[in-house]
Regions:
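Catalytic zinc-binding patch centered on the HExxH motif and its immediate surroundings
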Residues: 30-72
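Alpha-helical scaffolds flanking conserved acidic
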Residues: 71-76, 94-100
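Active-site recognition of the HExxH zinc-binding catalytic motif
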Residues: 76-89
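Active-site or metal-binding loop neighborhoods of secreted/extracellular toxin and effector enzymes
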Residues: 1-21, 95-183
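Hydrophobic beta-strand residues in large extracellular and virion-surface proteins
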Residues: 13, 17-20, 38-40, 59-61, ...
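Second-shell loop/turn segments in exported
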Residues: 2-3, 63-68, 89-92
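Generic structural signal for short, solvent-exposed loop/turn connectors between secondary structure elements
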Residues: 44-51, 88-98, 113
């Protein structure tokens, strides 16, 4: 069951948000969320590292790793879930929203030196290379090829296997909007 955050957990969240705020895209995301009143709760029993519910505006975090001084996993999870909170929720394109969020997290992690030891990211790296820094497609054939490979990767993961994908939603609009004024 969910519980409110302890002061140690809040400190972790504040540190992660401060780090994110030092990144152009992360700062834009935090700025866009200031009036959203997102609630953050802890639930060690969820399947994913984090979940965002657009109906309740609630973010659930699985693990705060209180024993560690810094928590890059939490920072990555917060970045991912906060990005979801800015996306236009669409059950028919849920997998597209995941791919967009994972791509943004991949680029954030590269900028911040955060490790991504996860097989999900091998084709995301290649998908990223088909886009410029503002998420515009620079090589359509590569983009379509690697987007399909990323879909195939995600469909092998239990958590995502039933998520719907829509070819018309392969646009990265949330990322484009956040990155447009970043260098």
């Amino acid at each position: 069951s969910t519980s409110s955050l302890s002061s140690a957990q809040w400190k972790k969240v504040e540190d992660a948000l401060a780090n994110m705020n030092n990144d152009c895209m992360g700062g834009k995301m935090i700025g866009a969320l200031k009036d959203k009143n997102i609630t953050i709760v802890h639930d060690p029993n969820i399947k994913a590292n984090g979940l965002y519910n657009p109906k309740t505006n609630q973010m659930t975090i699985k693990d705060f790793k209180e024993s560690e001084v810094t928590n890059k996993d939490l920072e990555r999870t917060l970045f991912h879930e906060l990005l979801h909170s800015l996306q236009t929720h669409n059950e028919d394109a849920k997998l597209n929203l995941e791919i967009e969020a994972h791509l943004a997290v991949y680029r954030y992690a590269v900028r911040k030196g955060i490790s991504l030891a996860d097989s999900k990211y091998s084709n995301i790296l290649l998908l990223s290379k088909s886009l410029d820094e503002k998420y515009n497609v620079i090589d359509a054939d590569l983009y379509n090829d690697f987007y399909q490979k990323v879909i195939n990767d995600f469909k092998k993961i239990d958590f995502y296997k039933d998520f719907k994908e829509s070819p018309s939603a392969r646009n990265m609009n949330t990322n484009k909007n956040l990155a447009k004024d970043c260098e």
